[in-house]
Swiss-Prot record:
GO biological process: CMP-keto-3-deoxy-D-manno-octulosonic acid biosynthetic process; lipopolysaccharide biosynthetic process
Location(s), subcellular: Cytoplasm
Catalytic activity: 3-deoxy-alpha-D-manno-oct-2-ulosonate + CTP = CMP-3-deoxy-beta-D-manno-octulosonate + diphosphate
Record-listed E.C. numbers: 2.7.7.38
Molecular function terms from GO: 3-deoxy-manno-octulosonate cytidylyltransferase activity
Main location: cytoplasm
Coiled-coil stretches: none
Function, in words: Activates KDO (a required 8-carbon sugar) for incorporation into bacterial lipopolysaccharide in Gram-negative bacteria.
Name assigned to this protein: 3-deoxy-manno-octulosonate cytidylyltransferase
Length: 243
């Protein structure tokens, strides 16, 4: 199975400026993410960025990189410029891997692409069980609820689903944390770029809600992955000490 991993790397994040370049165990975060992508079996790994410093670092490490010319509302919108620049065909599987997922292992990256093809999906993504009450109420952790067939009903920074009981057993079996990775065909990315932003997307600041808004379905694979956490804010760096 052939797939391309594209990593959007925005420099000026409101919650964590210069995030792609932060040092994690002696290497910039973006290099960790790239290395995992390379190990996944991807035929190509491409970085798209709005910053010259990131561009130079990635280029120095021998990875394809595109310096984007425009401001975008989301990483998915940024992908379209890479797809057009590199003349990627409509039937090519694209894995959109968020730069702030440096601990997502190569097998999980591969499996998101594999699910897309095997199940003939429009969009494939990943979630892991939430294990503690603190994560449920953390707005930087995106929650997802799914239907009986594994398709997303909604993504939110708020507590979903709401309940009265937050004991550890109930939390572990009822709450899911979304992981920043998507697989889809290049044709769908082109379609997505033609959709206007939805009001829910703007309210929650979650690009995947645009997909649901326009009636498309997102399949969510639920995996029990240890030590899988994203770097959203400076405080998340504290998790690395226990990693």
């Amino acid at each position: 199975m052939e797939f391309i991993v594209i990593i959007p790397a925005r420099f000026f994040s409101k919650r964590f400026p210069k995030k792609p370049l932060i040092n994690i165990n002696g290497k910039p975060m973006i290099i960790h993410t790239i290395e995992n992508a390379k190990k996944s079996g991807a035929s190509r790994v491409i970085v798209v960025t709005d910053n010259n410093e990131i561009y130079s670092l990635v280029n120095k490490n021998g990875i394809e990189v595109l310096l984007t010319k425009k401001e975008y509302n989301s990483g998915t919108e940024r992908l379209i410029e890479a797809i057009e620049k590199f003349k990627i065909k409509d039937n090519q599987i694209i894995v959109n891997l968020q730069v702030d997922e440096p601990f997502l292992n190569s097998d999980n990256i591969f499996n998101v692409a594999k699910k897309l093809k095997e199940k003939n999906l429009i969009v494939s993504t990943l979630a892991i069980p939430i294990l503690n009450k603190k994560e449920i109420f953390d707005k930087n952790i995106v929650k997802v609820v799914i239907d009986i067939n594994g398709y997303a009903l909604y993504f939110s920074r708020s507590v979903i689903p709401w309940c009265e009981n937050y004991n550890s057993y109930y939390i572990k079996n009822n709450f899911l944390k979304h992981v920043g990775i998507y697989a889809y065909y290049a044709k769908f990315v082109r379609l997505y770029s033609n959709y206007n932003s939805s009001k829910l997307e703007k309210m929650e600041n979650l690009e995947q809600l645009r997909i649901l808004w326009y009636g498309k379905r997102i399949y969510v694979s639920v995996e029990n992955i240890k030590n899988c956490f994203s770097i959203n804010t400076p405080s998340d760096m504290l998790n690395i000490k226990s990693f």
